[in-house]
């Protein structure tokens, strides 16, 4: 890994400034919740005057080294580690596991961080945790991963998948035990992690977002537009939304926009055609941040049927856009959606319940609809990125979370 000039920072005193190394198995240009959180966290820390370094897979195998990159409008040093494409997945790249520790040693020698913040325990995070612990560097770990989330890309036979999940949680436990503090995005995710490992005292710390970056138009809509934002993969259960659409009154003329891309796109486009929905369902593929926000602003509601969300930044983005949320009653989504207040929950995979919930929103009076919009806007304030940054700064310094 070669060196590169460190971006200049301002407005901090030397005693307050920290050199932070964030270890990620997924980072820009990847589009997913874990990568987006790491980007916002890193940019927010740079804005506060800290010296932030990222260790992440290279964008292409030969494009390795240390580069000054602009992330969320802020410059920081990103140490790109030689990686390979995992072809069963539509974008995933990975560092060879047996090379993780040597690469970690090299980056640690170069950066000399005050603290490590791991965003994954699988490859890069594992290497950093093992080598960082040897050097007695303070480690904070955030878990974004459920082994269940990666089952579809392992190519394992069905009967081996249960063993893989058990093995995955054991490996997570071995790495997370090296951290002085372990966090997850929500209380439900923290409880789940504690049940699945021997970790205790896991702290719920929201991924956070800056609500002012999103535009909410409060008021009834002229068109009935459903939107989903996220990876187009199996665990997102987008097919449930398509089946629910067939149960809606055709007079409502409901359209559905899927913002994002993934390995299930062709299958879902085929399903939409088979269900007679091809003219009302639009898959955008990858879009810019500006386009994503426009789709949210113009929608009537946000629908998410996913069964494996540890928080869901996309749902928070929809809330910041003033949308009622219809979400599966699974994992951490009930943490964001308060049934009957800023949206409705439905039994996971139950397209009939989902259709009923969507109908309820479409049939609301303008006043009822606006009340639900304002409830989303109010609820998302608890997830302000500055609160998240405050907590992590404290954890980096060893200050207990309030």
Where are these regions (language model features)?
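Short hydrophobic beta-strand element within catalytic cores of glycosyltransferases
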Residues: 324-327
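A short, well-ordered alpha-helix in the C-terminal region of glycosyltransferases
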Residues: 367-382, 394
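N-terminal subdomain of nucleotide-sugar transferases
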Residues: 2-69, 74-80, 387
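Aromatic "clamp/platform" in nucleotide-sugar-dependent glycosyltransferases that forms part
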Residues: 307
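A conserved mid-protein helix/loop that constitutes part of the nucleotide-sugar donor-binding site
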Residues: 36, 224-247, 252, 256, ...
